[in-house]
Every structure is written in structure tokens, then in C-alpha cells.
Amino acid sequence: MAGESGPVTLRGIAERLGLHVSTVSRVLNGPSGEQGRAASGETARRIRELADELGYRPNPHATSLRTRRSNLVGVLFPRLSEIVVATIYEGVEEEATRRGLSTFVTNTHDDPATQRERIGMVLGRRVDGLIIGDAHLDGAALADPALDGTPFVLVNRRTDTGHPAVTCDDRLGGRRVAEHFLDLGHRRVAVIAGEPFASTGTDRTTGFTDRYREAGLPLPAHWVRHCGFDTAGGHRAAAELLSGPDRPTAIFAVNDLAAIGTMGAARDLGLRLGEDLALAGFNDTPLAAELPVPLTSVRSPMAEQGRRAVRLLLRRIAGEPVASEMLGPELVVRASSGVQIGPPPR
């Protein structure tokens, strides 16, 4: 329909599905409390799937007048200067624009007091819902009474409190790195684990250490080092791990920035990546393949997380039941993890 006879319309969608145009309108553009009651679950699903397929875009001004919604979504992230966060936000903005929505984004710097203050500020903008990308595992900031009655979803990070989230399968990603190191014969391995309050760090670490434990090679506690998700934190943690005579032969850094910091520490100590030390990161940011020693990394679907978070939020706004979604990771092997140094453990 799109590209053949002009913009996709509610009437055109209704005709394709054999429904009354008012039913389609209520499902796609009705007030949030009524969308879930406008049609049966199966009919609403068919309407939304066809609207997605055809690229239907509501008129935000007309919809706002009709529904008394602001068509504004609040977005909270730790800091947009980080490439992973920026890429996720690109997905959020792309999908929101496609759905006739605008976004209002703010940084919280992973500080609980700032999180609470920014949540209040964003809610003051009369947003229809929130996408929260800075959640801590304990979910403390999300217990703010100000959020009562406001639909929200999490992206990139989950909580232990069960809020709906769109994330990468971080445990599986960590497990993939462990299997790669095991295949190369590495028995003495360490993890630069990121911040303990973030599910991204804890889940990736757990996936890695669980796989080594299954292989009969549990990691000593001092070979799991927490640090900031940045190059400076990775450099400090790696320097501590690599400075003594009892050092690991392989390191898994739970994000690429910490892995790049590890590269700097290895350089300072005269260690050759891929020879004296195997290294892997996580997220497969664009820089990973272009480094002097290309970085083995777990590719996570960053922009797709953002797009799916918008879709999940819209279902919550419509009053539909939703469940968390985990997207599959992919290990991309490059020179930094080197060659086989011994037989895999039996």
C-alpha cells in the first residue's frame, strides 16, 4: 500500500483486514487505557503487525488532540557520550519517530540521587511513558512513588525486581567467551567485571565464570575485578591482574572500553596481545575491528534493543501484558584472543 497509493492510512489498514476503521483507529491511536479494550488480543495483534509491515505513521498532532496524550516518551541513560548508550538511543529515536512520537532524553550518570531527580523532571514533561536505560540491579530508583501509574520499560539492563526489560542475553554472551578461551586451552583466566550494580556486568561475568566452573576450573575471587565501564577503569583493573608473577593468560573485559584499557595496561607491561595475553571484550563497538590488534568481542544488537524497547513501552501504554525480551549475542573472533596454547579441558 505504501509507495503504491500514497501514505498508509487507517482506512487502508481496515480494508486489508476486513475491519471497521474505528476499530483500527482505537487500537493504534486510542487513549492508552482504551487500546487494550478496543479489540480482542488476536485482532489487535493483527492490526499492529500489518501497521508495522506497511510502515504506518500516525499524525502526532491529530493523535494528541484526539487522545489527550502528549506523544512524548522520556528516556533515561547513564551518559549519552558512551557509544553503546548512543547506539541504543539511536534505535529508540528511530522507532519513536516511526511511531509518531518524540523523545526527551536525559543523563543520570548512574547516580541514584540524580536518577530520582531526573525521573521527576521527565515526568513533569507529561510524558506518556519512560524508557529507562540506567537501572540498577536492586531497582531502588524504580520504587519511587512518582512512577506509580506511569508505564515504563527498561533497556540494556534488567533488575532483580522483575520490571519488563529489553536486553542482550548477557549470560550467554559471557558463556560464549568462556567457551572460546577453553577451546584455546586457557585455564588461568580473569574477568574485568564492570560495576557490581549493573546487570550487564554481573550477568556477563556470571555466564563466563559458570562455564569455567562447569569445566572444573573455578575462578579465584581475586581474578574477578570490578571497575568502571571505561578505559581508565579497565586499565587499572588489568594492571592489578597482570603486574604480579601469578598472572592470567586470558582476560574477559565485560565491555569494549574496559578491554581497550586492558590493552593499554598490557602494552605498559610489555605484553603482546594474542601471544602473551588473550583478550576479549563485549558489544563489538565499531572501534573493536580497527584497533592495532583487532579485538575479539561479543556483538550485541544495540540499536535493536532500543527499537524493541519502544514497541514494548507502547504495548504497556495500551494496557497489554508484556514480558521481558532477550536478544541473542554473537562472538566475533579477532586477533586479540590469539591462537591455541594447549588442549581444551576434558
What are these regions (language model features)?
Residues 1-69, 346:
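N-terminal helix-turn-helix DNA-binding module of bacterial transcription factors
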Residues 60, 77-87, 106-114, 140, ...:
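Hinge/beta->alpha junction and helix N-cap segments in small-molecule ligand-binding domains
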Residues 98, 148, 212-219, 244-247, ...:
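Short helix-capping segments at alpha-helix termini
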